[in-house]
Amino acid sequence: MNDTVREPTGGLGVNHGPALSVVLAGGGTAGHVEPAMAVADALSVLEPNVRITALGTARGLETRLVPARGYHLELITPVPLPRKPSGDLARLPPRVWRAVRETRAVLDLVDADVVIGFGGYVALPAYLAARGIPGLRRRIPVVIHEANARAGLANRVGLRTADRVLSAVPDSGLRGAEVVGVPVRAAITALDRMALRAEARAHFGFADDARVLLVFGGSQGAVSLNKAVSAAAAELAASGVSVLHAHGPKNVLELLAPRTPGQDDPPYVAVPYLDRMDLAYAAADLVICRSGAMTVAEVSAVGLPAIYVPLPIGNGEQRLNALPVVNAGGGMVVADADLTPALVAREVTGLLTDPPRLAAMTAAAAQVGHRDAAAQVAQAALDIARLAPSRRRAVGGRR
């Protein structure tokens, strides 16, 4: 195996007691790591003695996010995957099988009872390693969660031998999947925006009765969102709209001011990133954002109406992610190429100055949002693990 990141003192270490051992395969991007961490937290609540191991690679966000959350991380060789299948599994590059061998070693090390996979290049080796070898290696049960509207290659492969399959939305391409939503951290799902609103607006310097637009494009920001919204700053201010804009740590935001701002103009608060998304969500009335699965899940879980601007890459997954909320009336989709300053000023002003319409969108977004997905995925995995033949044989001794 590659280098190993050990848990903080007092964390959940590796041992071989009677507690259930769960391996989470969700490394790489935030869209894979964050749902895995939400499920880890839910597992710890449902089964306080559970032993949790996250599987990841040295190049993924998990090297920072997993230890920060207090969980144990094991690293394997990264295996970037194509978006579409390209031949039989036997023809996959040798590094895949190296990653599978490393993953088998991890599963043995932690005496895994169940693997929960979230797709991506960490999940595929985990699914293959969990299959076992008749007469040589025991099979380990697998639970799959698909966050995107269109399932990726890893989860489509894992589907063949998975014991339970769950998804964020219907028709993800995974046959027999149970729709539960996207696992979201408890700090977001438990958020009461109205109760926190006064504190949140004071934190960012907004008036209690402000009309607040929140803009963010993910952890690195989004250049097209930055340009369109910042160029509309004067028009938004003239309409009484305050803005909280997370532009990304690598980006510079230029506010164009064709008119002289007055002392009573609503503030335009620009920050590189937001480390308190709960306060940002509580302060906002409307959001402009991308439509990655995790973003849509969080925004709808807290009941915020949104203008979703799908990232114009891939197979159109981001647009599909937003459609359930949009079709329910909780948001709208604007193509990246159509996001102009004029459109921003027109749509944002129109929504924030029409309380009945905004209230209807808010209610629709909240209705679509899932707040218990993490607990449902965690419970499914615990149920599968307890029923596994290898677990039953192990009662009173090692497997």
Curated annotation (Swiss-Prot):
Catalytically driven reaction(s): di-trans,octa-cis-undecaprenyl diphospho-N-acetyl-alpha-D-muramoyl-L-alanyl-D-glutamyl-meso-2,6-diaminopimeloyl-D-alanyl-D-alanine + UDP-N-acetyl-alpha-D-glucosamine = di-trans,octa-cis-undecaprenyl diphospho-[N-acetyl-alpha-D-glucosaminyl-(1->4)]-N-acetyl-alpha-D-muramoyl-L-alanyl-D-glutamyl-meso-2,6-diaminopimeloyl-D-alanyl-D-alanine + UDP + H(+)
Membrane topology: Peripheral membrane protein
EC number: 2.4.1.227
GO cellular component, one term: plasma membrane
Keyword list, A-Z: Cell cycle, Cell division, Cell inner membrane, Cell membrane, Cell shape, Cell wall biogenesis/degradation, Glycosyltransferase, Membrane, Peptidoglycan synthesis, Transferase
Taxonomic superkingdom: Bacteria
Protein's GO biological process: carbohydrate metabolic process; cell division; cell wall organization; lipid glycosylation; peptidoglycan biosynthetic process; regulation of cell shape
Pathway assigned in UniProt: Cell wall biogenesis; peptidoglycan biosynthesis
Described purpose of this protein according to its UniProt entry: Cell wall formation. Catalyzes the transfer of a GlcNAc subunit on undecaprenyl-pyrophosphoryl-MurNAc-pentapeptide (lipid intermediate I) to form undecaprenyl-pyrophosphoryl-MurNAc-(pentapeptide)GlcNAc (lipid intermediate II).
The protein's name in its UniProt record: UDP-N-acetylglucosamine--N-acetylmuramyl-(pentapeptide) pyrophosphoryl-undecaprenol N-acetylglucosamine transferase
